[in-house]
Amino acid sequence: LPAAALAPGRRARQLNAAAALALLGTGVGLLAGDWGGGPRPGDATLTVYSANLEFERSDVSANIEEMLAAGCDVAVFQEVTPDYLRQLRAGLEGCYTEVVSTSRDDALGAAMFARVEVRNATIESAAGSPTPSADVVAGDGTVVRVLGVHTTPPIHGVGPWTAQHDRLAAMAREADRVVVAGDFNASGRHQPMRQLVAGGHLRDAHREVGQGLGLTWPARLPIARLDRVLFRGLEPLSLSVGCAAGSDHRPVTARFSTAGRRVSAVVEKVRERA
């Protein structure tokens, strides 16, 4: 608070009272889970879905139903086999466009689908991990870079695992607004994940607007949040964990406003009441 607000006088007392009410109201809101909110008039939204299909085990039709029900604008998939890709194409035909894909018979297949305008679509290599990348155009014309992630687990080598996270951080820095979604094979305690968030100047959607622990792996009795949505330059509105549909991972859906990060709720409410 400004020093003037602590000085004696009627105006100072009004400012102190307004600030106290604002802080109290904000604290109650945070305890109640009021981390996100809705878009303001004129703001566009962008909803991103990510699912690790665990090659040869998933019920792809259930994933399709889930993403359609959520009204997703962009979907990224990991562990996409040729058969899974055929199912995705058939199930999403007429609703979504196949942006990029590389289907494989191992765990490194990947695909991206979208129902909004997309530019500069490609599959980049994040130190050997195929990474779908595209500039997605939201309803208000805002361009958001979306990256679909699947790093290799550290049991296959800490070096490649770390290098992939480092490369993702560099890729994330190339855009003002970015969403990095997928299976990171790392929890928030792992150093490569911390370096990715810090190096890419990213924020974690679950930390800001998610409910519960947000655990995604293993699906039946999850103990870790390997699947997540990181972002920059947007405002998170919601983050939810979906049904496994046969995979060993649970999918995640994140919804954003293109407004970007708003002024701190505490500061904003103090200004309104002062």
Regions found by a protein language model. Give the residues of each.
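Short acidic/polar active-site loop segments enriched in Thr and Asp
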Residues: D73
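Transmembrane alpha-helices and immediately adjacent membrane-cytoplasm interface residues
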Residues: P2-R40
